[in-house]
């Protein structure tokens, strides 16, 4: 038997403990909050509550009733071959009836009873207080009258006792004094009494006012409760109405129920009348013809075909007005899905897109903008859906409510190639990074932080070669100050101008370091003049840019450059949140064979710690290890500190934002969503075809393609090389990067190259053993490079070999016809004198008459005297027979030429 305490039972049924104890007492059970309640006592309490609410049946009347109707009929259908079969048809109807009146009356009665009880209690309290006040006033009046009578009797007794005059006078004086004193005492008592009455009256008024306010508040609460119940009931009715609109099987409205029953009754009566008239007509027909008429067919005959009642036949009326609805469009959508959302055929959508100038198929993915234009063109209202709600929620769930503190500046070294950027940074770091790069040029973004006497500075060293434009732009976006290194002997070069444009686009201050001032041909003033043409004005000329003359080789003014950087940083007042979850930017990334994906992250805010979960573009992972630029293990990194992190799921793209998140599962979902979105957008862009490009696409079939599989050591090099190779494409030869990636060359790359007939280019990477075996077996061209110049030059040579050669005709000899002879075998033979060059046998010729070409063919016979010869030189006579041409005349000229093939190259 299950027993509960009174307190547990009150929590279970949602009733206050005091209220439940009162109900138990009313039911004849005296309990406390800690007593046990048995099942019999619960049943007894339930019976008491039902009787109290007027329910004596003991069983609750059901508030919802569901009725089901089934109607069966038989339909004869044609089964083919002159036969028919009977099909049983069952029509099911289901209706649900809800008893609302009991619920509404009960709730209304409870609200009225609560308000009535509150009002009665308030009136009862007010009556008790009034009776109490009257009793106190009666007691006070009785005490005053008694004191007055006692005073009068005392005075009378004193007067009667005085015998003589002195005694009388003395008694009189005493009586007067006593009366005077009594009067004074009485006045004092009266004043005290009045003051007490006034105080009591004020207290009673205050108590009365509080009782009235409490009663009014209770009434207001009861009224608000009734209004809320009324609103809740009305909302419930609206919800019920919505349910009726949604599901026509569930009808809770009494009027709708009655109307439906009335319609069913009328339909049934009409069917019965129709059936009765048919049966009577059939009976009369049988009476007239002498018996019933039965249609027979086949061997044993068959039943007559039953006609379906007209009321049961389906009728479809096509709407004349096209339904306009809200169309919800995601970032990408398939054409067929868009048509379904607009309730039109997919061919209509394709027609609209063709009118707008875009070709599409029924299963093609289109972007959000195109779908929006199509839907609005067809008159629908478009609702653009944001599919990155999870991404925004994950990125916004951060605890960065900390105070910002000053941070070190991030300085990017920019400039033209070989102007001394890395050498300047070398002198600052006291290292030799320049010697470590192949060819002495920087091909990666190097991130370093340097401790100086006045503070810490973080440097980003960018390449200066034209192929690394994306790297320089990425460096400018993550920086606070740009130091533009310009050689004093070279002046402003193309990459110098490009670096100025990147700095201005990023909106960061520019400090110009004029390098190589120790050379004899150095001309710093010329550098200032050239830079002024690009709105880079020195401070001494009234501009905003600081110029520092340095020598990276000798270390001249390097300290002044650092002071200038720190001064500019102090003006900028750079701050960042040091505590909390970290966020930064990926400066560089690569695939290490032993450690996996490695990303160089520049922390911009917060503190990145070992073990944090990092979301980085399409990749995610837990930080397994962190190393600084020297290679030492670190456990945390604050703002403006570059570190290498290990543990990501893949190699992120350089420039991606790295953010620390709380949940690894959500980070994986966001990364997968980003990857899927990237694929969808890429597919939508690739499949987009314009009508005006159709003919150019058809003509593109004659273009030769050079397929390349590119692998490099870091992501930045992959981007730079792929961009440079793509720009080499011409109208005749197209460079197609079929595959690119970071890390060593694997067997998968070899299979891809074999399938696409591509060459493999490795930049600072090598192929493993399995890849080398696959490459040798398939005879794939594999080349390794460490300098980007050599890679681009060799690709140019390969493209030049794919170009169609040019052909040039060169005249090698000229002969003048002096006489014409007839030969029975060869026809007309021209006797000629060679005037220029030499005449070769089987060479193509032209016959000129009055310097006009009248025939073009080839030599058939070349003789000197009676001997066949291979060639005849200038100044000799010969006989020439022209193949398939006999109209040779004296004075004609025979021009002999040959076609020379000229090899083309790509500039």
Curated annotation (Swiss-Prot):
One of its GO terms (cellular component) is cytosol. It is found in: Cytoplasm. CDD domains: IF2_eIF5B (cd01887), IF2_mtIF2_II (cd03702), mtIF2_IVc (cd03692). GTP binds at residues 415-422, 461-465, 515-518. Residues 26-317 are annotated as: Disordered. Residues 415-422 are annotated as: G1. Residues 461-464 are annotated as: G3. The keyword Repeat does not apply. Keywords: Cytoplasm, GTP-binding, Initiation factor, Nucleotide-binding, Protein biosynthesis. Residues 28-44, 101-248 have a biased composition (Basic and acidic residues). Residues 440-444 are annotated as: G2. SUPFAM superfamilies: Initiation factor IF2/eIF5b, domain 3, P-loop containing nucleoside triphosphate hydrolases, Putative DNA-binding domain, Translation proteins. One of the essential components for the initiation of protein synthesis. Protects formylmethionyl-tRNA from spontaneous hydrolysis and promotes its binding to the 30S ribosomal subunits. Also involved in the hydrolysis of GTP during the formation of the 70S ribosomal complex. PANTHER family: TR-TYPE G DOMAIN-CONTAINING PROTEIN (PTHR43381:SF5), TRANSLATION INITIATION FACTOR IF-2-RELATED (PTHR43381). This is Translation initiation factor IF-2. The gene is infB.
